[in-house]
Structures are given as C-alpha cells and as structure tokens.
Amino acid sequence: VADANKVRLVGYEGGQSMVAPPALWGNTAVVQKLADANRDPGIAALYAKDLANWQRISGDVLCLFSSVSKYTAQGGQPNPAGCWGQLEYDDSTDSPKMAGVRQFLAGAAGKV
C-alpha cells in the first residue's frame, strides 16, 4: 500500500510482547508463562530477527514501544496486559529484548 501510494512505511509502537487474550488474564499460570518467555535469553535472537525483517521489508523508521516497562502489576503478579519494555527496570543489565536490539544494531551498522 505504501509503495503503491509512494509514501513511507513508518512503524509506530513496534516491538513485541506476548499477551494472553483478556478472557485468560485471570489465569496466573498462563500470564506467568508469557512473562517468563519475555525474560528468556532466547528472545534476544527472535527480537533481532524481527527488527531485521522490518528493515528488509520496509527499510524505514520503526519506533520501538516502551523502553522501560515493568513486567509485573500491583502485588508483584505478572502483568496480564503484557510485557512491553525492552528493559524491565531502568537499571536492567541483562534484558534479552535489549540484547536483541543491540544485536540488530551491531549487524546493521551503516544501514540504520
């Protein structure tokens, strides 16, 4: 559509999270499993691949949503609305999502 209309394809609020359907938000086991997946080191490679796919398909700007966002809600339970931040806390040092962003940027030097 963007090419056909000769306009840029710019992504807003990009990135990923895994969110249970609202009907399952009360299922702590499901919500916890999704939060754990967002913390899994394997997410780094998937995140980098997702960003590379965007660059390959669009080659244009993609604004990632939410630099920092806690994965827990009040009471310390996993957040049923999703785990959106690249960092879970502003002093995080081991975020798999941020590692994926860094992997992508390292491989895309001169292209972004």
Predicted regions and their residues:
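Structural recognition of the beta-strand scaffold that forms the well-ordered cores
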Residues: 8-12, 60-65
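Glycoside hydrolase catalytic-domain groove-lining segments
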Residues: 1-23
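Aromatic-rich peripheral "rim/lid" segments of glycoside hydrolase catalytic domains that contact
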Residues: 22-54, 63-112
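Acidic (Asp/Glu)-rich catalytic clusters
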Residues: 3-4, 54-56
